[in-house]
Amino acid sequence: MCGIVGYVGKQQAAPLLLDGLCRLEYRGYDSAGLAVCGAEGLRIRKAPGRLKALEELTRGGAELPGTVGIGHTRWATHGEPNEINAHPQSSADGRFAVVHNGIIENYARLKQELIRKGCTFRSETDTEVVAQLLAWCYGQCGDVFEAVNQMLSQLEGTYALGILCADTPDRLIAARKDAPLLLGFGQGENFLASDVTALLRHTRDVVYMDDGELAVITADGIRIYDERRRPVDKEHHHIDWDVDAAEKGGYAHFMLKEIYEQPEAVRRAVTGRIRDGRVVLSDLTMTDREIRDIGRICIVACGSSYHVGMVGKYTLERMLRRPVEVCLASEFRYSDPLIGEGDLVIVISQSGETLDSMAALREAKKRGARVLGIVNVVGSSIARESDDVLYTWAGPEIAVATTKAYTTQMVVLHLLGLYFGDVMGTVDLETYSAMVRGIEVLPGQMEEILAHTEDIRAAAKWLAGEEDVFFIGRNLDYALSLEGSLKLKEISYIHSEAYASGELKHGTISLIREGTPVIAVATYLPLLDKAVSNVVEVQARGARVLALTTEAGAAALHKRVDAVVPVPETEAMLLPQLGVIPLQLLSYYTALERGCDIDKPRNLAKSVTVE
């Protein structure tokens, strides 16, 4: 959740670190800080609040001259968000500065041991324990590398660490366990970061650190050591993302830009995967025999990716004619899941670093299941540890609220269902062909929706004044309702809940009163009559209803509801792919009307790398 940037080279470090932290703002944070080694020694500057406060404090970095440094944006887990608790944290003697993403679970015990040894603490953070323990180990052995090893051997929990020592001012040390960290390679300069977006303007050649590894970074090169501290050579990944894709490009917000990028993102996700009317997934290493022998299928994800999994369940069950389970990753890892050899676990994650999803992946592999990752970030932890990986090719997604990652994950799941169904012989030719044709025209239909947003903007104006909103839907529309509700609550701060329409009578309808906004998602035409009945039901209690439906459904609903937002006709299983766009726009324009911080909603982070 926190952002880490490190630099060693010939340039002034502080301005470069500030730029990198700016590109990590989307991850969420409540304070920021820098530590730089220069002629004046090791100096640290920190500030609570937005990054602008740190930029002003350091005069854009000019107050911290030096060519080696680390920077950090903190999301508070231990101690309130203030200057003292911000990172970098330092040892009492001022010799070490540490930035940290993760949670040190045994920090309280370590802190008490250090206090008994005479250490004094200033902050409430677990990270200061790392810095103080490191200084104590250094005092015992006199060697920075060995001190880091001794310190790491005593830590329990998760960490991505960047370490700067005044006694070795030409280098950084990095270490990782269950939290993302990568190394960037330049010419006469090298980098450290928690996210590749921080480095795109400086290098495209990166190495992703694995758990237990330690790296020593100098201007001349990077030495990487495995868990047993043996030197290792690791594969370099070249990042092809467009630098401009991580810029707003004239849009008011990243979220709006990314909404409008969805047609092209879906085109990229499909390119090369449909040939002559057939789905071809050459990315997969699974043989036809292995596909036919798949036992249970379980989709594991968090947040919006979980909602994608719910849609994927319908697609896979329809195509494969076998049950599919969808689990929240945070529950799966603790549920003693009934999976084993021959079963397939599909892990979905935009970042490929979500901690709960990583833990679920490892639990699945420990039990003998095969793991297929669906991720956006090339070379991420989930991509590396999965048996197979399908990339979504959505490109950088900066806004906290996901948009194009959601739609590309969904189209990849559709392609997977078609491919497996074809191999297994469980999908009929008519359905297969119709789905393929539908996927091929999806980008154009998405562009059609994005060209006509007047009704959505009008609905957002009246929705913006509300404090409670309900979404209802059945079947695929229920899964879509969950995503629409999540989008609205996370960026507009309106209390929003989604319910399966058939459950209204089981308690929820008691919350409907005069003027209550209800968004009825009714794109699934086989159940349109049921949707109309539910609309009548809530209107009888005074609800104000906005219906999201197809062009055909609009004819049945437009005289019954307060407003209708239509989407083009397509195959039923593809409708969530189109229906989500008006819901994304509705959330965006509602939040805009309310003056919310759309790209960086309060209390939220883009990549959740702690429990």
Predicted regions and their residues:
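Conserved short alpha-helical segments that host acidic/polar catalytic motifs at enzyme active sites
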Residues: 1-253, 264-298, 334, 429, ...
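Hydrophobic alpha-helical scaffolding
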Residues: 7-10, 100, 120, 137-141, ...
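Glycine-rich oxoanion-binding loops at beta->alpha junctions
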Residues: 67, 71-84, 275-289, 312-348, ...
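Generic C-terminus detector
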Residues: 229, 544, 570-611
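Active-site phosphate/pyrophosphate-binding segments
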Residues: 262-266, 270-298, 388-517, 591-611
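Glycine-rich phosphate-binding loops that contact phosphosugars or nucleotide phosphates
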Residues: 292-434, 438-441, 521-526, 530-565, ...
